[in-house]
């Protein structure tokens, strides 16, 4: 731990999944304009990845070079599969979902709402079937029940990939069926197997879920970030940086921190009687969102995402590691969870991420942000999410990085409510422009006629002039280097836009 008389600079990075793009933008401002060189770094989940990579160097130039690597890797992501890779059992479940949905629809048309037989299957699930039912059930009854469970399983499956919407499905379920949510899915499949109608697909799904204990494995982005070319844990141990990675033990339920040496300490920085652990595994444990990624074994216990207990690990930095100048960068807003469209048809990952990384985290994070501010930290946080924890779109990632830069400038220099409103309107307008450009030019776009496309381009041109005025309302020292060019060009996309931006002068 640093012991000099100089200010002890600390950097605290929250969790946030794909939303860490905001943090990268904020860090660029802090390193390039403020000139920070933290000697203490703490992080949770995605923040643990960023912090651990930066912690390989103690000098400013070395840390800034690591940040440049993170920036490059983040901008190269193209889809949610870069961060979340489906396991075979879950991929099969998603593949078979539409078939089961169709069976459900046929059953509803033929027989109406699930009645007596649905109740019998529900009774079987809860182990409360009456003795008379058990002794008089026929093979035909079992077949009917199996078909109905198959259909009911389908009602709980959304076949969409993370962050891409949903596929067509049957009519919304009757109120009595609305409680059948993805959390009950595997239980339903197991019931189907019990009544003798499980095929190889269902066997693979059940056995895979029991064996893997998660729906996904970390995508290639994690391997890239932890590749020896980017990250070498020996450099962390030798750099002199004080590092704390937040993890939560499943067995004890306790919040722990892994240090730069791989040792384990409690929330008050007291050493625990555990052998040192591998730092790469500790980072993976800090990112192990329950159900999404499997728990990671560290020493004698299994660990999951540190955000389960502490999303913004500022308290240990400020109260126990001697930090006197603290910069805390939060990936998502702590002012409440924004309302989203209906989750009735969302896939399992979307529901888990919405509850664990947004709703639950918001409740915990509010108190942590209040504590950090009360203890004198400069807290940098967004007022809204440019994209959610699952969305990986290169254009939105770029906008979120720029938003982080602007918000860091506001936090550092101080900004009036009116100035913050300009930033908010500017970033929201860029997001709207990006969506309009996607609608007009993306290969999958519904826009086919040139005349319609030109009308959309005219609308985009008008929004670009609005963007120009907003950019000019932001003090120049708060803009990224290319900020004054934002209105002159197209936003970033994963495809080429075949026409030049006609609104921008040569």
PLM regions: where:
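Patatin-like phospholipase
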Residues: 1-44, 52-506
């Amino acid at each position: 731990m640093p012991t000099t008389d100089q200010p002890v600079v600390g950097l605290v990075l929250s969790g946030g999944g794909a939303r860490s793009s905001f943090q990268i933008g904020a860090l660029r401002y802090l390193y390039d304009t403020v000139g920070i060189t933290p000697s203490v770094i703490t992080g949770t989940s995605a923040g643990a990845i960023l912090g651990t990579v930066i912690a390989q160097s103690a000098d400013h130039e070395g840390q800034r070079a690591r940040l440049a690597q993170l920036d490059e890797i983040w901008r190269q992501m193209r889809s949610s599969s870069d961060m979340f890779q489906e396991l075979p059992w879950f991929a099969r479940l998603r593949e078979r979902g539409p078939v089961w949905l169709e069976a459900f629809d046929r059953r509803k048309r033929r027989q109406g709402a699930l009645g007596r037989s649905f109740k019998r299957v529900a009774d079987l699930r809860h182990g409360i079937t009456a003795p008379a039912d058990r002794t008089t059930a026929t093979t035909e009854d079992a077949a009917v029940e199996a078909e109905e469970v198959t259909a009911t399983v389908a009602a709980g499956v959304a076949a969409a990939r993370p962050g891409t919407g949903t596929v067509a499905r049957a009519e919304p379920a009757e109120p009595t069926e609305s409680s059948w949510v993805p959390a009950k899915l595997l239980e339903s499949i197991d019931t189907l197997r019990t009544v003798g109608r499980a095929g190889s697909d269902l066997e693979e799904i059940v056995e895979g879920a029991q064996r893997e204990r998660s729906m996904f494995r970390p995508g290639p982005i994690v391997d890239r970030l932890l590749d020896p070319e980017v990250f070498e844990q020996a450099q962390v141990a030798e750099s002199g940086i004080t590092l704390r990675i937040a993890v939560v033990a499943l067995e004890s339920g306790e919040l722990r921190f892994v240090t730069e040496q791989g040792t384990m300490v409690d929330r008050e920085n007291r050493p625990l009687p555990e052998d040192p652990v591998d730092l790469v595994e500790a980072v993976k444990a800090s990112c192990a969102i329950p159900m999404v990624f499997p728990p990671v074994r560290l020493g004698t216990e299994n660990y999951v995402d540190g955000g389960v207990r502490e999303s913004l690990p500022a308290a240990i930095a400020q109260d126990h590691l001697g930090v006197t100048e603290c910069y805390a960068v939060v990936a998502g807003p702590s002012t409440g969870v924004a309302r989203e469209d209906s989750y009735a048809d969302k896939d399992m990952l979307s529901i888990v991420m919405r509850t664990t990384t947004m709703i639950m985290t918001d409740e915990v994070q509010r108190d942590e942000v209040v504590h950090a501010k009360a203890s004198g930290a400069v807290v940098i946080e967004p007022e809204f999410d440019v994209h959610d924890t699952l969305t990986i779109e290169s254009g939105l990632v770029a906008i979120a990085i720029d938003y982080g830069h602007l918000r860091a400038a506001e936090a550092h220099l101080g900004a009036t409510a009116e100035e913050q409103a300009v930033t908010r309107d500017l970033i929201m307008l860029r997001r709207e422009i990006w969506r309009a450009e996607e609608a007009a030019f993306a290969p999958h776009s519904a826009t086919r006629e040139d005349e319609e496309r030109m009308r959309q381009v005219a609308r985009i041109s008008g929004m670009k002039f609005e963007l120009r005025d907003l950019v000019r309302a932001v003090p120049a020292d708060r803009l990224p280097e290319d900020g004054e060019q934002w209105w002159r060009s197209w936003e970033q996309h994963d495809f080429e836009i075949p026409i030049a931006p006609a609104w921008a002068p040569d």
